[in-house]
Amino acid sequence: MVMVLSESLSTRGADSIACGTFSRELHTPKKMSQGPTLFSCGIMENDRWRDLDRKCPLQIDQPSTSIWECLPEKDSSLWHREAVTACAVTSLIKDLSISDHNGNPSAPPSKRQCRSLSFSDEMSSCRTSWRPLGSKVWTPVEKRRCYSGGSVQRYSNGFSTMQRSSSFSLPSRANVLSSPCDQAGLHHRFGGQPCQGVPGSAPCGQAGDTWSPDLHPVGGGRLDLQRSLSCSHEQFSFVEYCPPSANSTPASTPELARRSSGLSRSRSQPCVLNDKKVGVKRRRPEEVQEQRPSLDLAKMAQNCQTFSSLSCLSAGTEDCGPQSPFARHVSNTRAWTALLSASGPGGRTPAGTPVPEPLPPSFDDHLACQEDLSCEESDSCALDEDCGRRAEPAAAWRDRGAPGNSLCSLDGELDIEQIEKN
């Protein structure tokens, strides 16, 4: 509608059109919408409309006079000829302004317009930022930067900023704090050590989520915040910042009173990953390794004694009747040789059965001597019964030493190397 009027006015010429034809229709239009996305020139406040003739592409033939000065009062019927095209455009724009005439901000811009960076370079001169006046929800933020991890960046001049997932960041061209009282209030908000070079300023420190830049005063006690500072989870603006009292401490003053915005702390920041650790696996409890069964020598010796008692035919010979010591020893040696031949290289014994050890040489000599003595006694005393009676106690006395020198007892000691080999 605006473009049609401007083209028609430019083709016909401003001189040929009567002034009274547009006065009633253009001066009392109905407000079409309060939405913020009507003009691609950007959203502007009332005080910004004076720069419309310089910035926006809607140019007039004589742009020297500002558009608002050529608007007449509603009572006067005479209009300036030069202002006909200006009135056609500006009356619509003035009624479609988003902010009220009292200065109170209306609805904020849409989410797409806030986040979009699709303005071209040609329209960058026309674009101005939408800044509400003293709003509790909308704070002036130029760019939302996300510094995850909370790294402290130190610069060459000693200027340090703690930059973490910033829900608030001061713009690069921030408002200059003009008085030392504001400095004192700003530094007292974050508590800690007193800043250097600021007279009468409350202490400021760096702890946890707070930031404490080394702010150097520039001529006349002014602080120049040229770099963008960020304060995590804090939402405040310099427009309505009121410094707390001098004796207020974080313990005495409640949290909502100390916050300038009066809003609760936002816990839904997407980049704050300090509370939960991502990608950390829980360690499983270490499995207790079961100990391998060790060799129980006492039990093995007991099994060996029972095996020897079963294999030896001493009990059977006693039940059958009196035998000569020669026959008794021969039966013992035959039983052991049969066991050794069975467990030789041809066949293997079961794993649980103890293996009898080979006869020691001393025991072999003892058996040989015993056999020789028994043979001599049997030859010399074959017909004499008394000689046989004397040989029996001697054989019984000799047999008493045999259990002590038996194969499996060996004073309770086993040859472990022989067991492992078998």
Curated annotation (Swiss-Prot):
Residues 245-268 have a biased composition (Low complexity). This is Protein FAM53B. It holds the Pfam family FAM53. Acts as a regulator of Wnt signaling pathway by regulating beta-catenin (CTNNB1) nuclear localization. It comes from Homo sapiens. The lineage of its organism: Eukaryota, Metazoa, Chordata, Craniata, Vertebrata. GO terms for biological process: positive regulation of canonical Wnt signaling pathway; protein import into nucleus; regulation of canonical Wnt signaling pathway; Wnt signaling pathway. Signal peptide: none annotated. Belongs to the FAM53 family. GO terms for cellular component: nucleus. The keyword Phosphoprotein applies. It is found in: Nucleus. Interacts with CTNNB1. Detected in skeletal muscle, kidney, spleen, thyroid, testis, ovary, small intestine, colon and peripheral blood. It comes from the Eukaryota. The modification Phosphoserine is found at residues 118, 167, 169, 179, 212, 268. The keyword Phosphoprotein applies. A motif (Nuclear localization signal) lies at residues 281-284. Residues 245-269 are annotated as: Disordered. Keywords: Nucleus, Phosphoprotein, Wnt signaling pathway.
